[in-house]
């Protein structure tokens, strides 16, 4: 079926419940996730059902307010390097920009959660509706802030403040973390020339590592009840570890995941702990929130080294293993409205 405006009274969707797969496609910037999503929409035109893509909210970031958020966050780092801003002031401004990045994701997530957050369903057929959302709020509230912390652009306190606003995920979320070898990743970054964006190698390595740590975090939680399991034996997250994460891509998608491989490990810091090494309660609540968000998210990895058509086919094939929920047919028009506004 062709993609576009969702039919409200189409004979194809007249049942009371519409089986829906909700996919968040994510990863470091410049890998090719957005192109893959667009190619899947095109490929699905020849299959039953409807596929809709919510792109990155560039209009919101670049044109809706007085400041271009994409260019602005890089400009802050340039001003810091030139000595025009102190490291402390630059960190505060960076946190402000990062919150601005998060705003449209939070708005969309809140809107869709009231529509798509029904119980999981088992459906062996192709879904009636596939929703592909370019990035989960985890990106702007957890992954990018942590990467900025690793490179020295943000404080750990600012990261925790952003993470505290992370929304809970309703049932049926599927997060695809896209990956790519570093050589091809850099080649694609140089080819896209997005205005105001810079190729910051330390930030790129940090993001690649953070997203793999996110994958390990989910794996760890599938075998353990909480981030508290093994916390007492976990070593303090050192400056050495922090520096390693920005120099090269060192975290791989291995089969085993220990607590030290997860995002939780970053917060084993003296300034966040009491005299016994236990995380202070308010900070612990933030990690609890991350754990609760991940509870309703399946996480997949997808290598994008192939052609756009091949990558789209691989993304589409993942649907057979994804969680599915239903949307009430009477709510389909709300999806259409959200798609129109978000564009």
Swiss-Prot record:
A Pfam cross-reference name: Herpes_TK
Example GO biological process: TMP biosynthetic process
Catalytic activities: thymidine + ATP = dTMP + ADP + H(+)
GO MF annotations, alphabetized: ATP binding; thymidine kinase activity
Binding-site residues, ATP: 27-34, 188
Keyword annotations: ATP-binding, DNA synthesis, Early protein, Kinase, Nucleotide-binding, Transferase
Keyword hit for Mitochondrion: no
Positions annotated as active site in the UniProt record: 56
EC number(s) on file: 2.7.1.21
Positions bound to substrate: 74, 98, 194
Stated role: Catalyzes the transfer of the gamma-phospho group of ATP to thymidine to generate dTMP in the salvage pathway of pyrimidine synthesis. The dTMP serves as a substrate for DNA polymerase during viral DNA replication. Allows the virus to be reactivated and to grow in non-proliferative cells lacking a high concentration of phosphorylated nucleic acid precursors.
Assembly and binders: Homodimer.
Family (UniProt): Belongs to the herpesviridae thymidine kinase family.
The protein's name in its UniProt record: Thymidine kinase
Species assigned in the record: Feline herpesvirus 1 (FeHV-1)
């Amino acid at each position: 079926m062709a993609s576009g405006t969702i039919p409200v009274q189409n004979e194809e969707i007249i049942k009371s419940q519409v089986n829906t797969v909700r996919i968040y496609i994510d990863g470091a910037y410049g890998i090719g996730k957005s192109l893959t999503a667009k190619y899947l929409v095109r490929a699905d035109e020849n299959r039953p059902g409807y596929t809709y893509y919510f792109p990155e909210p560039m209009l919101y970031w670049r044109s809706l307010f007085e400041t271009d958020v994409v260019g602005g966050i890089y400009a802050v780092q340039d001003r810091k390097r030139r000595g025009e801003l102190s490291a402390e002031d630059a960190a505060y401004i960076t946190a402000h920009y990062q919150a601005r990045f998060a705003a449209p994701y939070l708005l969309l997530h809140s809107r869709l959660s009231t529509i798509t957050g029904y119980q999981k369903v088992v459906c062996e057929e192709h879904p009636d509706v596939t929703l592909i959302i370019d990035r989960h709020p985890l990106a702007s509230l957890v992954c990018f802030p942590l990467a900025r912390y690793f490179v020295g652009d943000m404080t750990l306190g600012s990261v925790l403040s952003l993470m505290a606003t992370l929304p809970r995920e309703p049932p049926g979320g599927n997060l695809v973390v896209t990956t790519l070898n570093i050589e091809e990743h850099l080649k694609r970054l140089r080819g896209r020339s997005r205005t105001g964006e810079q190729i910051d190698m330390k930030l790129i390595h940090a993001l690649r590592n953070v997203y793999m740590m996110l994958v390990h975090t989910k794996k760890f939680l599938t075998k353990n009840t909480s981030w508290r399991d093994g916390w007492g034996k976990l070593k303090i997250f050192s400056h050495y570890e922090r520096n390693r994460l920005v120099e090269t891509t060192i975290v791989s998608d291995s089969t085993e995941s220990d607590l030290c491989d997860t995002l939780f490990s970053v917060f084993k810091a003296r300034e966040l702990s009491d005299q016994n090494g236990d995380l202070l309660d308010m900070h612990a609540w933030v990690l609890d929130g991350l754990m609760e968000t991940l509870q309703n998210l399946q996480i997949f990895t997808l290598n994008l080294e192939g052609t756009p058509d091949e990558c789209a086919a691989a993304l589409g094939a993942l649907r057979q293993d994804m969680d599915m929920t239903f949307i009430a047919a009477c709510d389909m028009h709300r999806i259409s409205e959200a798609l129109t506004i978000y564009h």
